[in-house]
UniProtKB/Swiss-Prot annotation:
Keywords: Chemotaxis, Cytoplasm, Hydrolase, Phosphoprotein. This is Protein-glutamate methylesterase/protein-glutamine glutaminase 1. One of its GO terms (cellular component) is cytoplasm. Involved in chemotaxis. Part of a chemotaxis signal transduction system that modulates chemotaxis in response to various stimuli. Catalyzes the demethylation of specific methylglutamate residues introduced into the chemoreceptors (methyl-accepting chemotaxis proteins or MCP) by CheR. Also mediates the irreversible deamidation of specific glutamine residues to glutamic acid. HAMAP family: CheB_chemtxs. The active site is at residues 171, 198, 295. Phosphorylated by CheA. Phosphorylation of the N-terminal regulatory domain activates the methylesterase activity. Pfam families: CheB_methylest, Response_reg. It is found in: Cytoplasm. Residues 10-127 form the Response regulatory domain.
Length: 357
């Protein structure tokens, strides 16, 4: 129930294209629990209508006249925060801007498509994200306030030479959550770090890697097929591919697989978890941060059963508690920590794996 006395999800549509505003209205029209609160044709109008209409969710374009989407996101999130979903193109520039919007406080994005064949897919993704994000509003707003927290790099004491690996899984809310975790990992971490962030095929993961690399001591890169795995490097799975690891003749390499989605996503956490078990066995430290659905639940259970160490983000600091909750329910989690304590826990668990304590 919202402040207007109904249980519908009041949505504000922001796009400078009248055609696109109408298209989004049409996509949402068949959802009985979603109500269009209004629309806006630029960022300034979005800021004004956000204040006057008090929507539950805002769908925001990036490139608009008068005030662009990035400025509007920053203004709204600094004054009267509302969950914002960016509606962005899959171009290099569009990917960069969408990622910047996520860093400024937007919760998620849905990629635009010029093909009419993708309309049903976009509609489903948009509706699913509106519903899931709306159901998590309190956690989202808490996390927005916590983004001001910038901790120091966590130092560890190591006596091994990279006999273990770290896995981090995330989805909705992942880019901002990853920014709370990866830059605080030490540059001398004697293990590779594999990151599966649910992203569509395109340029988003590359832009994410470049952003995190700028902020971190570790080297962060988008993973490439057949690349040799090196300790101290963070490999982010590219969108549209499952990332796996395979060891042959004493050398571990990344294998990118173009196949069917698992849990409706590609890359999937469960896929790399399975392959990591084959290579690293019990010598895995795994953290699941945020996201819808249950990807990672089965994989984390197998990692824990094999003797690996697993962490889930706490509900009160998680954007979307679906994936962590599913992993906890499956019995796949050793410890639950607030997002800002996860770097310390990764380092602590890594010390145990590395030093055999």
């Amino acid at each position: 129930m919202n402040e207007f006395g109904d249980s519908m999800i009041r949505t504000l549509i922001v796009d400078d294209s009248a055609f696109m505003r109408m298209a989004i209205r049409s996509m949402l029209a068949s959802s009985p629990d979603i109500k269009i609160a209004g629309d806006a044709c630029n960022g300034k109008e979005a800021v004004d209508k956000s204040k006057s209409l008090h929507p539950d969710i805002i769908i925001m374009d990036v490139n608009m006249p008068v005030m662009d989407g990035l400025t509007a996101v920053k203004t709204i999130m600094s004054t009267d925060p509302v969950p914002i979903i960016m509606f962005s193109t899959l171009t290099v520039e569009g990917s960069k801007e969408a990622l910047e919007a996520l860093q400024l406080g937007a919760i998620d994005f849905v990629p635009k498509s010029e093909s009419h064949h993708d309309v049903n897919k976009i509609e489903k993704e948009l509706v699913d994200k509106i519903r899931n994000i709306h159901s998590s509003n309190p956690s989202i707003l808490r996390l927005i306030n916590m983004r001001k927290f910038k901790g120091e790099v966590v130092r560890g004491k190591w006596s091994c030479a990279g006999d273990f690996a770290v896995l981090i899984g995330s989805s909705t809310g992942g880019p901002s959550s990853l920014e709370q975790v990866i830059p605080r990992l030490p540059g001398d971490l004697p293990a590779p770090v594999f990151v599966v962030q649910h992203m569509p095929e395109g340029n988003f993961c590359k832009q994410l890697a470049e952003r995190l690399n700028f902020l971190s001591e570790l080297e962060i890169k988008e993973a490439r097929n057949n690349e040799k795995v090196t300790a101290g490097v963070v490999y982010i799975a590219p969108g549209g591919y499952h990332m796996t690891v395979k060891k042959a003749l004493g050398v571990t390499r990344i294998k990118l697989i173009k196949s069917q989605p698992v849990h409706a996503v590609m890359p999937a956490v469960d896929v790399i978890a399975e392959s990591m078990l084959d290579v690293y066995g019990k010598n895995i430290v795994a953290a699941i941060l945020t996201g819808m659905g249950f990807d990672g639940a089965a994989g984390f259970k197998k990692i824990r059963d094999a003797g690996g160490s697993t962490i889930a983000c706490s509900e009160d600091t998680c954007v979307i508690f679906g994936m962590p909750k599913a992993a906890i329910a499956a019995g796949g989690i050793d410890t639950v920590k607030p997002i800002f304590e996860i770097p310390e826990e990764i380092v602590r668990m890594s010390e145990v794996k590395c030093n055999g304590k």
